[in-house]
Amino acid sequence: MNKFYANERSVLILLALLKAHNIKRVIASPGTTNLSLVASLQSDPFFEMYSCVDERSAAYMACGIAAETGEPVVITCTGATASRNYPSGLTEAYYRKLQILAITGTQDETKIGHLHAQVIDRSVIPNDVVRYSTHIRATYTDEDAYYTELKINQAINELFRHGGGPVHINLHTLYIRDFHVNSLPAVRAIHCLDYTKIDSFPKLPKGRIGVFVGSHATFTPELTMAVDNFCSAHDAVCFCDNTSGYYGKYRMNYALLGSQEKAEYTNINVLDLCIHIGEISADYATLGNMVRKNVWRVSEDGEIRDQFKKLTYVFEMSEIDFFKYYTPDEFDLKRDYLMECQKLDEAIRARLPEIPFSNVWIASQLYDKLPSGSEIHFGVLNSIRSWNLFNLPRDVHSFANVGGFGIDGGVSSMLGASFINHNRLYFGVFGDLAFFYDMNSIGNRHVGSNVRIMVINNGRGQEFRNHYHTGSIFGKDADKYIAAGGHFGNMSKTLLKDYAENLGFTYISASDKEEFKNVYATFVNPNLTDSPILFECFTDTDDEANALKAYWNADKDIKNTIINKVIEVSGGKQALRNVLGPRGIKFFRTILNKRT
C-alpha cells in the first residue's frame, strides 16, 4: 500500500518533534481517535513499534522498556475507557521516574459532557500519575501550529526535567482518511539543559550576539563582571531598559532606537543569537524592533519561556555560571557592536525635536539630575515608557511593577523600598490613574522624608489616547469609558495639594515648562529634607501624545526640518521646483532619505 503520513498538522508536528528529540519506541493499542497517529508512525521506519491490545499491559510494558533502555517510550490509545487503563502503569512510572509519553486520542473537547459516544473528560488527572498533561487541539492556522509545537516541546522536555517521569498528551484528531503526505514539516525543537548535561551544551553560533534583559533584580558585582567579560569576549551587547538591573560596561538602552517608526537601519537590530535573561520587559520598542534568529533562555527555573517564538535552548542554571562557561579564559577586548549601537543612538538624540510639556519632556529634563545613589520607581505604562527613552545615571537604580503589569500598586512598592534605607532618596513617577489608585499608601505612618513622588496628571489614562493605541481612534470620546477621564477631581489644582499637605508632604506643582523650571530643583535636591515631597505636574493629553510621537519619529523629524527650511528660503514649494528641476528634486529626496 502506498500510504504515508496523515494529512493532519497536529499529527505531523508531533511526529516531527518525536524524531527531533530522538524518541523512537512506541507501543500502540488499537482505536480510531489515535488511528491517524498510529498509521503515520507505522509508515516511518524511524519508529520501533510494538502492539498491545490491553492498555494496562501496554503501560506496564512501557515501564519495562524504559527501565531496560533508559530511554523514553510512547504509548498511545483511543478515547473512552481505553485511556482509563493507563493510570496504574503510569503511577508505577511516576514513582520510578520512568520516561513514558502517553498519547491519548480524543474527539473535539466541545463534545465532553453532551452524551457523545466514546467521549470522556481527561482534563483532570491525579497528581501522581503524570508530571505534566496537555491538550493539543486540531491545528489549522500558523498560530495554531506554533502553539501545538510549543506545547509538545514542553511535554517532551518534562519527560527528562528534574529526574523525569511520565507525561500525557491528549491529542484531538479528525478521523482523516488522507494518508498521502510524504514528508514531515520543519519544526523547532526546544531542548532544556542543566548542569547534568553540560557535555551537551551547544556552541555559540557565529554572528552577532545580544543579551536581552527583562525585569531583573539588581545585578551583583560578580554577575556584572561575568556579563561584561562575556560581551567583551564575543563583541556582544546587553540590551536593557530601566527595569533590567544591569549597569555594566556593555549596557545599551535601545528604547529610543527601537521606537523609531520610520527608521531604516542596516542590520544593527538583527541578532544571530539572543540570550534572554530576566523576566517581563516594559521595553515594547526593543521587544518589537529586534530580529532574533535564535534565542537561548537562561533561568534557574528551567521553564520554557518562548517570548520571541525563536527559542531553541533553555539553560536551567545560574546566569553567572552560564556566562562564565561561555567565556574563554583569555580574550581580546571587543566593543565594535556596542560602539555601533551607541553611535546610532547618539545620532538620533542629536535630532530630538522640541516637544511640549509632557511626561517625556519632564523625563528629558530630570533623567540626568537624579541624585547619585538614589532609586526611582515608575508607574506603568506611560511613565516607564517615557523614561525608558533616556539613560539614567549608572548609580541610580530603577524599578517598575512589570510582573503583573498593573497600575494598582506602584506607589506602595516604592514606599516599601523606602522603608529599608532611610538615608537613600526614593523617587517615583506615576500617572494620575496609577497614583490615585494607590493614594491611600502615602498616608502610611512609616513614610519618611526620603520619599519624592511625582504625579503626571492629565486627567485620564494617557495610554488610550496615544496615536498607536486603538482607543485613540475615538478621540475625546475615549475619555468617557475607555480612558476613564474626569475622575479624581478632574485635574483639580487643590485636591492632591490639600491631601498631601495634610499628610505632612511638601507640595509643589507645575502646569508648564516655566513653572517646572522654577521648582524642579526642590524635587531633585540631593539632600534629605524635613518632609517627603509630592510634585504634581499638570499636562495636556494631546501634548502627551504629540510629544511621544515626535520622539518616535525623531529620525524623520530632521528630514522634515531640512525640507521646511529649504522651502522657506526658496520662496515656496513651486519656487524650489523651478530652481531644482525634476532631476534636482529627485537627487534632493535621495540625500534626505539616507540614514546614519
Regions found by a protein language model. Give the residues of each.
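Glycine-rich, anion-gripping cofactor-binding loops and their flanking helix/strand elements
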Residues: N85, V213-W296, I304, P393-N423, ...
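Active-site diphosphate/adenylate-binding microenvironment
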Residues: V11-N22, S29-T33, L37-Q42, Q342-N423
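Alpha-helix C-terminal capping segments
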Residues: S40-D44, M61-P72, P87-A102, A233, ...
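Phosphate/pyrophosphate-binding active-site segments
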Residues: M1-Y5, A285, N289-N382, Y499, ...
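N-terminal cofactor/phosphate-binding cores enriched in small/glycine residues
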Residues: A6-T91
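Glycine-rich, acidic loop regions that bind phosphate or pyrophosphate groups
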Residues: T104-I152, C240-K343, R445-H446, Y468
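Structural signature of the thiamine diphosphate
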Residues: R25, E68-C77, S83, A93-K97, ...
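Thiamine diphosphate
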Residues: I103, T110-S123, V129, L389-T596
